[in-house]
């Protein structure tokens, strides 16, 4: 779970994660937050023995944080790996549902755009930008996924092992699209489960125009440059997951 200036959310989100999955292990990756998020995370370790904290020097970005987290998970031999935000836009109450869906899938996406998914706090312009971005990405890259830019995911270890982590130099939406793209092109089974995605109530959003521009440019470059090789396999539909 990457963090940057999330001191107001951290204690509550950590407590909610452990309430949802008591036997989990949690890694907080803090990019030198000036508000003391990293130090607060260190202090929580006494209460949560399976909580670990990675301190990075400076704001190095979401994509590199997840790559570091993936490497950590591989080193520690974790079979299942989640990624999520620390601001409660990704509600920990959905963690058991994502984990259950991983019984029939390799990558599970907490999706805003399958039936049952919602973005209740978004205005028209944000819905338009996000909706267009997802249609654009899945059309250009031919991805059978409704929510290509989702950042709430559950991976089986084999998916992360198949990623070329050394080659990933992306942030934000582009990073999220790339993980879906690589998983699909390498033949892994992908499912989407619906989530309600509220806006953060505390703290400041990290979204920027640069992140959106990076994602648009990445999609074009990925399409023009080919992609990861591997046999395609049709993903399990969200309807199959909902009925399981």
Residue ranges and their predicted role:
Residues 14, 23-33, 54-55, 84:
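Short beta-strand/loop segment that forms part of the nucleotide-sugar
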Residues 40, 103, 158-159, 217-244:
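Terminal low-complexity segments of carbohydrate-biosynthetic enzymes
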Residues 54-75, 80, 92-173, 200-215, ...:
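Acceptor/aglycone-binding surface of glycosyltransferases and processive sugar-polymer synthases
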